[in-house]
């Protein structure tokens, strides 16, 4: 097929030669196009690849940032014209080649006699037209189209053999290539962007959104979160690695976390149980508390009056606060909030520091001790004589 195309181009150039060429005619280089041992099916093959007029969207589902102008197309498989029978076609091709050889000899003879006799310009043109007409008829008899199927959008040359129709234009198959890698696309699927064709691999590498986790192009479903795009399987908790469910996620320092881990790691902790505080809470002693956890550290009684006493970072009721401080009256067992008397390692309300026998207040602070009890001097002398 390529030899016949070259022959047609050579013959067309011959018809356009001016009068200067007749003064020294050169033989057509037909010897360069000798017949090859090829199957007639290959010689007479006609391929027409039709383009879909309504290309599919580039990203079919779940994409959020692929522009609508990106188009995914697929050219139809090549279709061949029914070839003539091998026997008759081979005979016609032999006859055609013999005719061309004869014409070559005639042109060579005219070249040798060019100095003695210059052929008439009209006779030469008529001869070439006749030869071309006969060649076109014989090619048509073989089922080979002699009228160009259009001009290639890449090289701008006529297309006489296989043709691809894509992007609203015609192409030589070898010239319909990926804009980026220059690999031949042929009838393979391709993507269109801004009027240019791309193979699927290059299109995704150049234009598809990329996963914020693995940085690879996202070819199918895409998840958008935190102003980034992700493969759905790559959007998971930064702590436990679990993929997020219907409950969603929480963000901290530009990282996603599931609810459980987020609360465990970043929510305020109760000062009593050290568990996350989610709803109602109390704020005291520079921390937060579950209401049920804010109780006395000894008796676990809640502070109904709203007042409490702090000791070593823990809340206490008044009684147990003074008990831990050692400020309970040894006489009545109640907290001492005012003046007190210290004796025998204990503290007493002044009114409760009395003689254990006569109950007289030891106001002067003079007393006698016996068996961990206080006595005034007269009672002590009576009860414990020497």
From Swiss-Prot:
Gene3D superfamilies: Cysteine Rich Protein (2.10.110.10)
Phosphotyrosine, modified sites: 22, 62, 72
Domain LIM zinc-binding: 150-208, 209-267, 268-326, 327-386
Sites of N-acetylmethionine modification: 1
MF-aspect GO terms: metal ion binding; transcription coregulator activity
Alphabetical keyword list: Acetylation, Activator, Cell adhesion, Cell junction, Cell membrane, Cell projection, Cytoplasm, LIM domain, Membrane, Metal-binding, Nucleus, Phosphoprotein, Repeat, Transcription, Transcription regulation, Zinc
Name of the protein in question: Leupaxin
Native source species: Homo sapiens
